[in-house]
Amino acid sequence: MTMAANLLEDWCRGMEADIHRSLLVTGIPEDCGQAEIEETLNGVLSPLGPYSVLNKIFLRQENAKAALVEVGEGVNLRAIPREFPGRGGIWRVVCRDPTQDAEFLKNLNEFLDAEERTLEDVVHLLELSRASPPKTQNRSTENWAEALGVLLGAVVQIIYYMDAEMLSQEEARAQDLAKAQAVASLASAAGRKVKKEPGRAAERGSALKMENPDGWNDVADGGDGPKPLVRKAGALTHSRRKRQKKTPKQEPVPWKKSQGSHSHSSASLKHPEADDGKNRERLEHVRNNKKPCVKQEGSALKKAPVKCAWKFPSNLPHVAASRGVASESDQDGGLEGPPKKKAMGWVSAKSPAYMRKKKVSLGPVSYVLVNSEDPRKKPGVSKKGPGSGQDAPDQKAPGVPQAHESPTSASQGPEAKPQSPLHASSGENDGRSHLGCVNKWMEGEEQQGKAGAQEPKWAESQMVGEDPSAV
């Protein structure tokens, strides 16, 4: 039956006939002629309305003929019987069901209305060739029915394409959002690391902080001492070596004596124990305020007051005056000069001979012996020889400066030959010991000045405390 329906459709296209008014009659014997065919059909179709036989064809599969019949307008195809008897057997009638076309057209119109499209838009979308103008309305409906199948296939493809495009866009957006979140998390983690670990730049910056030069004044007033710089041991020793090579040795300058120095000096002679107690209290106060000190600086200060066979001059008034100057500067409660100079104030205030010792510490030994020996040893020096008698009246008290005597003492080598071996060796040994003590004390003073001049009062009190025992 399907083959007969396809044959009817193809035949109507070839004959340009309306498929809705065409009939296909099959089962006609091969030897049946045109008159006999019309006579048989006349008995069946004439009551329904006019008809005409358009053409005949032979079917090999059925080994029979088939006739294409067109009925007139107004004939109801449903009233035509599907089978009727004829010559050679049963003849069958095949036609298009009108209800099938009506339902299809109805569905097509509803679809176009929902999409807000027309049949022309469908043709343009599918790029179909414009068909020839139909002769009747039924003819155009048939053409559009064929185009609908193509349209539905295209619509399905478009829907699939749009769905895939939307899915790809959503996936791309999800990936972009994930990347943005990852970048934000990395940035926040990096910011936290920077806040927690400032790095080596902050440590190096703290090591470059300058020390406050007025910090020792704050210590004298009762404040906290200056904090030590945070540096490596290797870098500190290297910088100190460079300073020792580049900076020349600074000579001590005596402090200016205040008007009330005599009274304070006398007070210091009368009450040495009270001054020692005050100096010890200040020493403990300074040590408490200077907890963060460098070990190297502490060792340098410990080496400064080296105990040796040092003999102070016999003129006690000058020594007492120097003690008075030191105690007076402590009682005033302030530092008039740098801490380095204050540590040596007890010597430089009234004893230029000691200053001369320090200046010519690298000079000849005889010069140091002349200025540092006690007056009780003068008889030993007078035994030098015939030239010693000339030097005796020229010698002055240890407190008087004798800068012009150094050349004569150095140039009296030939005259000093008659000196006895005992006194020469003893004087030479004493000179070496005094020179070593002076050199050690000068090295301690230089290290103390370069390390920041810390704890000058401790050195002063210790040196002053050693005077009675040394004398």
UniProtKB/Swiss-Prot annotation:
Residues 270-287 have a biased composition (Basic and acidic residues). This is Paraneoplastic antigen-like protein 8A. Residues 256-269 have a biased composition (Low complexity). Belongs to the PNMA family. InterPro entries: PNM8A_C, PNMA, PNMA_N. It comes from the Eukaryota. It comes from Bos taurus. Pfam families: PNM8A, PNMA_N. Residues 188-300, 321-471 are annotated as: Disordered. Residues 238-247 have a biased composition (Basic residues).
